[in-house]
Amino acid sequence: MSKKEIDAARRLMSLMFKAHPWHGVSMGDQSPDLVTAYIEIVPSDTVKYEVDKATGFLKVDRPQRFSNFCPVYYGLIPQTYCGERVAKLFGARAGRPDMIDDGDPLDICVLTEKAIPHSD
């Protein structure tokens, strides 16, 4: 197939199927300096959302209470994984050797003056 045919097939497939935000979306060509982020929670949310690991759809995790209000855009970095090795690295850098992994993609908090609405 030519590049033009491959690009056309990709566009067609993207209309039929949704890429899994954890595995099917690139971290970005300029990573680690500039990364793609999948936003799960925006500051105005009264509900905590989370990507369902099996389907990739955004699901309701639990209601947000006043004590755990998220003041920034919060989400994940695609194609990353916080496993034992990552936890040890971060723990050593933070001076906290007791850190453990959570088996999820790496979290990200996005600081911006621009509004980012939900659009999954």
Report the location of each language-model feature:
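Hydrophobic N-terminal alpha-helices or hydrophobic patches in metabolic proteins across all domains
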Residues: 1-120
